[in-house]
Every structure is written in C-alpha cells, then in structure tokens.
Amino acid sequence: MPDRLTPEQRHRCMKSIRSRNTKPEMMVRCYLFSRGFRYRVNVKRLPGTPDIVLRKYRTVIFINGCFWHGHEDCPYFVLPKTNTPFWKAKIERNRERDMQKRIQLRLLGWHTIILWECQLKPKQREMTLKGLERALNQIYLENYSLHKARPYPIIEEETGTMIAADGGEVTTT
C-alpha cells in the first residue's frame, strides 16, 4: 500500500513527534512531585537516558509509547500498513535496545519501572499512578530494611545486677 503523504509531509509529521516532556511523562512527573517525590529528568549518565530518575530510591522510570516500544496485546500498538517490514524491524530493534538498557541498569544496582502510554489513559490512570507510588514506597522500605539496627548491648556486672542501655538498673536472681 503506497504512502498517502508526500515525503515532505511525512518528514514534518515525524519531526513533530516529541521524545521528551510528552503528555504522559508530564502527568507522571506532576503526580510524583505532588506526592513529595523528588527526581531528575533525562539523566544522560545512565544507560537508556531514563525519563525519570529517583536517586534516593535507586529507581528509574521509563514512560514508553505503546507504538514506539511495541507494547504487545495493546490496542494502541498497530503496525502501519505501509512499509511494514521497516516498521517491524524498527520496533524489534527498540524492544531489544530497551531490554539491554534494563539489564545494564540492573547490573548497576538500579530498579527499573516501565509505564506504558495505555496505562495512563483516563480509565487506568489513577490505578496506575497509585500502583507506582506503592511500588516506590516498597522499594524504599526494602532498601532501608537491609540495614537492620543492632540491639543495645546489656552490660552484666559480677554482682548479678544488669545495667540497661538507658542507665536503669535491673536486678536478676
């Protein structure tokens, strides 16, 4: 099936597609900020240049478009009828690259969360954002529960009296 647009029109259409500060990304950023999460945006030093980086949580968030990243079983992912072999190969390369970047981030000790464009549509938005908040809180608790507090030592004296850590005496029999 031939393309209905001229090459100049197609170029203009493709050029207008943004990769940063997209509407789904801005929704997530606004929600996180309103809930007290502080983050960095598009950190180039990390593999894949994540959309949102929460350093305190060692977590990165990618907000993927269903078409560009090939979201399987999604109504928003439909291969174009024109130039299908090109698009199929491109989407497959994007998926492979995404997988490699997630592996690299995992090896560096980062948690990765992926949100899909379809999860941020009005019907699922609230549930998705609350799930994201819950996941971040869970990651925070897991990271900080690794450092278990040691109990205070109880010092025993030879007379059978123990001195508690707060200075109070306890007599034992």
Regions found by a protein language model. Name each.
Residues M1-I114, C118-T173:
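Nucleic-acid endo/exonuclease domains
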